[in-house]
């Protein structure tokens, strides 16, 4: 791969693919694609070219072998490989996972509960020692291995667990595995008493669930485009050929899922597109019956429903069965309605019942930006709860993201000011509020603070919050992610929630809504010389070219304050209303310890600031995503926080599309780009409805097949259509007529490291290969 006369890496030559013109014509626009022939995955020529690209990559990276080894050693030195999760109770057992040093996969285990009122999990290790004292010890009394993925993966080049559930009596396990990497799972049923498996296999399916008595399995099948489209019913012990189709979705925009309701009284089918949804239900008391629709679908209306009961809340002491409906029919940031199922009959309509909570209109906190400092309410500030449905009146752009109702408490997940939040209340109070026709009285869970000894919850040291060189005046310094987690049991008396930040390892807490008592159950252990107080995190706001202000998260190591010559690693996503929330990463420490500034622009297209933030970065507004990222990069560099010659950007999947776009639109801002399974041939893929996922993606990107405006708009930013000339003098498809930005002669195109998978069904290998 090298020419020894020119010496080493400098002489590496990339493999040059042959060109075979393939013409496509849509909306009167003819495009010649010279590399479409690479779509044939079985072609020996394609396989050889992939091998040549991999060899070229290995040759170019050979000089970094020492650094890669060092980074691996640093990562391993921080990781607690032998560990144990905090057990969660489901029916008669405590379930938990063990990881062991040198093993690739976790081992799922369980121990019997000590009695019906046993809600104290077996000891994992004290919170003060970060859960590290007992995790490496032997088995707990009565411990049983439920599923050892290391053993199951033997003999397979690829292995992924696609679901695992245990029957209510604890005897039968339903599990699915993928040994091909194509996200089609083979499900089997195992007797946990004997280890034997039943003869029937549900092969190549998407998901499956038991009924509580384990006599029936409901499962989802996929069509040729990998779309989950059908639900079938299987009687355990019978041939799969006798399985019955109970639901089929004809609309190719919709994906289908099936599962048990939280109270285990209903089997629930949800069919959803990117913008609308529909729920069907069947009582577990009559699993052979027919499903009935809960609320009929409506364009651009999403909803979900939880079935629960206000135990003993009726006038005569009877239970009140309720449906808790989460929807956006009247508010784009969602609301919660509670329907008394004694007085309302299906099919229901959105807006029935008592409106107990609602989001608030979009309007992000106009906090500190790179140009001027306007006072912003710090993230995590408590808000009042007046008696009306807008549960947190001081919030900006509050978006409700989900609700869960348990026997003893109710939890609400929402976000405001660009950060996730959790609120809770007792079930008793929820019933009282509902019967009185008033909003629910949620109490916000406050994130744990950081004090001198970081093992002891306290208050943050505001005096240490000064930004580098005064360039970030008054920036918000409490960045965190908080969410409900580890609450699989309807009967649990207390709720669990998770907490983490860019600088603080993940924590699992248990909270009692009745008393307000908060207990730290476990903190992820980071080995070696690690002190979270040595790392800084800030939220700043950058004004984009259209006047919108973009929240940006910054992380660096104390003593390496950002400066004009600093290296910067900047990452983004901005699609599907997915939020890039703060989270801890051991691997990130190696960057920060070397003085690299870590930056996350929360660009439009994500969900950080509510539904309007998403709408401003999709379909015919998609260019906002790319422009936001570019404007943030430029602002940070212009503010003297990073050097363009030392700036590297990262994005994966839809974030890989972002990487391709910024490389074409503003190559001068980036020295390098890492694109992980990048969606860089977006227009070609979205034009072909026979490809996996295409039709359902029209709700996200628009439909260029039938809409000429969408076609032209997508072509204006699709990275493959707009690629500048390469080193070999060739251009991407359509580059001669639609190139959005010619390479600037004074600034080389960024160096790009791209990765893909030959069996990826979401972003086909051919896109980054082309």
Role assignments for model-derived ranges:
Residues 1-494, 502-506, 510-511, 585, ...:
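Beta-propeller folds
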Residues 99, 500, 571-575, 653, ...:
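Glycine-rich His-Gly loop
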Residues 146, 150-164, 177-181, 513-517, ...:
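Cap/lid segment of the alpha/beta-hydrolase catalytic domain
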Residues 218, 232, 392, 570, ...:
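Hydrophobic/aromatic beta-strand patches that form the interior of the parallel beta-sheet core
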Residues 279-284, 293-297, 337-339, 351-354, ...:
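Composition- and surface-driven signal marking solvent-exposed, interaction-prone regions
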Residues 328-329, 402-417, 542-550, 602, ...:
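C-terminal substrate/ligand-recognition segments
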Residues 404, 489, 534, 546, ...:
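Short, flexible hinge/linker loops that cap or flank conserved catalytic cores
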Residues 600-770:
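Active-site-proximal cap/loop segments of hydrolase catalytic domains
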